[in-house]
Structure formats: structure tokens, C-alpha cells
């Protein structure tokens, strides 16, 4: 319901409406923070104010050394137009002949 109203007002009207609503929410937040009494429990006695030590930070994990000498696929970055030609020639003797439909191909 609010979207058509905002669209009719244009950019300036929508911005003005958003700023007004933001002020309402800011006022609500300050009311909530003032209504809560700090430092007293429900019985009216002050809470134990023990000083807590800051949380201990875990020891930093040592970084693993970068070693690219153990990379197994050494030809990975050497692809070219002839990369698979030798494999294609080796496997060509194992290929089965393809059945023909009886018609000549369009290139003949």
C-alpha cells in the first residue's frame, strides 16, 4: 500500500518519507534504551560487576608454504590445436566403421 503512494510522490517525496520514518525509529530506539535501568537487577540490588578478562585470541595458524613443484599434470597449460592429434591417431585403428544410409554425402 505504501509503494504506490511513494511512487506517485517521486524521488524527492519518497526520500522525505523515508527520512521521516527513520526519525520515528530513532526516537523509538532512544525510548527503549532510556526505559531500561542499567546496573540494577529485578530486586533493586546492584549486579555483580566482576571484571571479565578479554576473550583469549587463538594462536594464529602458520601459513602453508606454497610449493608448485609437486603439481602432477604438467601439460595442463600447454594445450594447442595439435594437443590431441597424437592420441587421435593412436586410437583411429580401433574405430569401427560407421554404417551408411545408402545415400551419397552432399560433398560428392
Curated annotation (Swiss-Prot):
GO terms for biological process: aerobic respiration; mitochondrial ATP synthesis coupled electron transport; mitochondrial electron transport, NADH to ubiquinone; proton motive force-driven mitochondrial ATP synthesis. This is NADH dehydrogenase [ubiquinone] flavoprotein 3, mitochondrial. Keywords: Electron transport, Membrane, Mitochondrion, Mitochondrion inner membrane, Phosphoprotein, Respiratory chain, Transit peptide, Transport. It comes from the Eukaryota. The lineage of its organism: Eukaryota, Metazoa, Chordata, Craniata, Vertebrata. Belongs to the complex I NDUFV3 subunit family. The keyword Transit peptide applies. The keyword Transit peptide applies. It is found in: Mitochondrion inner membrane. Complex I is composed of 45 different subunits. This is a component of the flavoprotein-sulfur (FP) fragment of the enzyme.
Amino acid at each position: 500500500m505504501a509503494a504506490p503512494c511513494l511512487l506517485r510522490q517521486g524521488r524527492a517525496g519518497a526520500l522525505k518519507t523515508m527520512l521521516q520514518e527513520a526519525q520515528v525509529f530513532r526516537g523509538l530506539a532512544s525510548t527503549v534504551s532510556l526505559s531500561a535501568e542499567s546496573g540494577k537487577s529485578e530486586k533493586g540490588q546492584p549486579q555483580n560487576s566482576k571484571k571479565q578478562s578479554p576473550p583469549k585470541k587463538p594462536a594464529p595458524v602458520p601459513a602453508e608454504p606454497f610449493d608448485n613443484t609437486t603439481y602432477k599434470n604438467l601439460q595442463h597449460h600447454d594445450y594447442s590445436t595439435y594437443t590431441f592429434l597424437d592420441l587421435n591417431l593412436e586410437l583411429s585403428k580401433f574405430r569401427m566403421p560407421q554404417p551408411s544410409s545408402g545415400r551419397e554425402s552432399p560433398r560428392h
